[in-house]
């Protein structure tokens, strides 16, 4: 039992380290882009500090999203939780709301297309049977 818990803890730590490395890499790439665009330099310590702050903020976001869903007596985080998280940044909230509405519209269109295809399929399956009846009457 104790070995399983230790192994699980090691896996969790390893996973967290990989996530941190991915965040660090992404922050480094973004800093490089900004450095080229603005003709400035970022030290390795600055990139590391931005990476650590970003990772901690993401942890806080994850905890907040879990709490929002739990408060609503849900086990799944939804777009309303994300909007609630972004409420302090008007531009981010607007962007998320616009994207959410865009996705909802796309989903509605896909549903309508599926429904139309299924209706067309059922009409096509009826037509040959009806045609057969007409032919046999002549």
Swiss-Prot record:
Name of the protein this chain belongs to: Centromere protein S
Main location per the UniProt record: nucleus
Positions bearing N-acetylmethionine: 1
Subunit structure: Heterodimer with CENPX, sometimes called MHF; this interaction stabilizes both partners. MHF heterodimers can assemble to form tetrameric structures. MHF also coassemble with CENPT-CENPW heterodimers at centromeres to form the tetrameric CENP-T-W-S-X complex. Forms a discrete complex with FANCM and CENPX, called FANCM-MHF; this interaction, probably mediated by direct binding between CENPS and FANCM, leads to synergistic activation of double-stranded DNA binding and strongly stimulates FANCM-mediated DNA remodeling.
Species the sequence originates in: Homo sapiens (Human)
Subcellular localization(s) per the UniProt record: Nucleus; Chromosome, Centromere; Chromosome, Centromere, Kinetochore
Any GO BP annotation: cell division
Tissue expression pattern: Ubiquitously expressed.
GO molecular function: chromatin binding; DNA binding; protein heterodimerization activity
Keyword DNA-binding: yes
Record function comment: DNA-binding component of the Fanconi anemia (FA) core complex. Required for the normal activation of the FA pathway, leading to monoubiquitination of the FANCI-FANCD2 complex in response to DNA damage, cellular resistance to DNA cross-linking drugs, and prevention of chromosomal breakage. In complex with CENPX (MHF heterodimer), crucial cofactor for FANCM in both binding and ATP-dependent remodeling of DNA. Stabilizes FANCM. In complex with CENPX and FANCM (but not other FANC proteins), rapidly recruited to blocked forks and promotes gene conversion at blocked replication forks.
Stretches the record annotates as Disordered: 110-138
Gene3D superfamilies from the UniProt entry: Histone, subunit A
GO cellular component: chromatin; cytosol; FANCM-MHF complex; Fanconi anaemia nuclear complex; inner kinetochore; nucleoplasm; nucleus
């Amino acid at each position: 039992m104790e070995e399983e818990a230790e192994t699980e803890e090691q896996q969790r730590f390893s996973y967290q380290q990989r996530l941190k490395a991915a965040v660090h890499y992404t922050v480094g790439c973004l800093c490089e882009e900004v450095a080229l665009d603005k003709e400035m330099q970022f030290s390795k310590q600055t990139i590391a500090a931005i990476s650590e702050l970003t990772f901690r903020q993401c942890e806080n976001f994850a905890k907040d999203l879990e709490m929002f869903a739990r408060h609503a007596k849900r086990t799944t985080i939804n777009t309303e939780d994300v909007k609630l998280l972004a409420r302090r940044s008007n531009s981010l909230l607007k962007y998320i709301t616009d994207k959410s509405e865009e996705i909802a519209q796309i989903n509605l269109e896909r549903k309508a297309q599926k429904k139309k295809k299924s209706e067309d399929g059922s009409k096509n399956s009826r037509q040959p049977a009806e045609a057969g009846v007409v032919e046999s009457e002549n």
